[in-house]
Amino acid sequence: MKITWLGHSAFRIETSKAKILLDPFLSYNASFSGQDIKDVSAGITHILLTHGHGDHVGDTVALAKETGAVVLANADLAAWLGSKGVDKIEMGNTGGTIALGSFSATFTNALHSSAQITEDGVSHALGNANGLMLHFDDEASILAMGDTDIFSDMALINELHQPDIGFVPVGDRFTMGGAVAALACRRYFNFKTAIPCHYGTFPIIDQTAEKFVAGMDGSKTDVKAIRPSESLSI
């Protein structure tokens, strides 16, 4: 498995059978600068969305039309995407699991909101925010937490799914900060690898993952604070 962080909460996940973009906020992502959308979207089979905010939906509509990738989203967000011309959609909701060929995706809880704001400034709710639990054939499992704060039922997610890898938001203000994220990982999960994300993109959120890295010091989890465009082979 090859995992590439594209900045913010966007990732490319490659296995022998699937090529996935997660929360592909690329065009207006300052951390994506210097990378090429055509390169990172080449050959993608699936686009997975944790929730409806613009910094996660990002380029989904254009990429889905260009590549023919299947888009997975919560039911309300899926309906909105359908109204924009996206026609290959797998919809679900919290607690549901969807089989996607060589892997499955389960919608887990997250403490956050999910909406799009129209030109008149009105916020339109698009279902609940979620994490996504990904189980692959013969590969490590991944929990993409999405945007969230810490919550005690993270323990149930770990009990049910035993994720090997965590994509962990650490930027504060809109999600939990690094110290709280470290507490969540140490108290509720047994990740073999944790990759911090959702930081360094906007001036008003934390610019580094240092608080998370410090909070994880001494844990059994291998923390990989990789740079945007950097890849890991796991």
UniProtKB/Swiss-Prot annotation:
An example molecular function term from Gene Ontology annotations: hydrolase activity
Top-level taxon of the source organism: Bacteria
Record-linked InterPro entries: Metallo-B-lactamas (IPR001279), RibonucZ/Hydroxyglut_hydro (IPR036866), UPF0173 (IPR022877), UPF0173_UPF0282_UlaG_hydrolase (IPR050114)
Gene3D superfamilies: Ribonuclease Z/Hydroxyacylglutathione hydrolase-like (3.60.15.10)
Keyword vocabulary terms for this entry: Hydrolase
Protein family membership: Belongs to the UPF0173 family.
Protein name per UniProt: UPF0173 metal-dependent hydrolase RL2074
Organism for this UniProt entry: Rhizobium johnstonii (strain DSM 114642 / LMG 32736 / 3841)
